[in-house]
């Protein structure tokens, strides 16, 4: 079994036990898509709260998610990403709920979403953006969840890893497209994935490069074609995350 297959098998079990929540009032913040369109002079940062990962194991188990998120916000991050997967990433929906209560910027629910139950739960916890990973879904399921998320007034970050997936994301009209430099089957990371796919951008979407960024030089590699980068592990390992986040700022 690959990492992705193992995660999805566990996710089916998790979602089967998950209650279907009533839709509650949505948390108020700005549209991340509109924010990116209005702030094109600088590469924007999606800063992530991540305790652990399948490939790296424990990264920062003792983190206070609220203090970490506040540090990111103070550093000028445009959005906070919160891992909510409990088994492989040691996150929780409570992490997201607490972060969303304590920051004013958009919060992304970072999880392997396979059900509308997860979309409603994320919205109720304060997320205004959700992640849909093309390699984790059939195209039919992707479209269903994409439409359900939009109906819930959520923004959707559609994640791709190759040209075929990018074509699907552009075809369905995704406004936020994330290119994951990490292969979810092997968990190997290569920023060259984002460099390669940039030549196939053909929509008015905002493009985000995800994974593998440690320095401003890394960010500069994708700064001409991408609007933002998503950074997790590099920030989670730093004693001063605000300083680390500021160090990744790159002018376009």
From Swiss-Prot:
SUPFAM superfamilies: Ribulose-phoshate binding barrel
Alphabetical list of InterPro entries matching this protein: Aldolase_TIM (IPR013785), Indole-3-glycerol_P_synth (IPR045186), Indole-3-glycerol_P_synth_dom (IPR013798), Indole-3-GlycerolPSynthase_CS (IPR001468), RibuloseP-bd_barrel (IPR011060)
GO biological process: L-tryptophan biosynthetic process
Record keyword Amino-acid biosynthesis present: yes
EC id: 4.1.1.48
Highest rank taxon of the organism: Bacteria
Catalysed reaction equations from the record: 1-(2-carboxyphenylamino)-1-deoxy-D-ribulose 5-phosphate + H(+) = (1S,2R)-1-C-(indol-3-yl)glycerol 3-phosphate + CO2 + H2O
Pathway(s): Amino-acid biosynthesis; L-tryptophan biosynthesis; L-tryptophan from chorismate: step 4/5
Keywords, comma-separated and alphabetical: Amino-acid biosynthesis, Aromatic amino acid biosynthesis, Decarboxylase, Lyase, Tryptophan biosynthesis
PROSITE patterns xref list: IGPS (PS00614)
Gene Ontology molecular functions: indole-3-glycerol-phosphate synthase activity; phosphoribosylanthranilate isomerase activity
Family: Belongs to the TrpC family.
NCBIfam families noted in UniProt: PRK00278.1-3, PRK00278.2-4
Name of the protein described by the UniProt record: Indole-3-glycerol phosphate synthase
Organism for this UniProt entry: Listeria monocytogenes serovar 1/2a (strain ATCC BAA-679 / EGD-e)
Gene this chain is encoded by: trpC
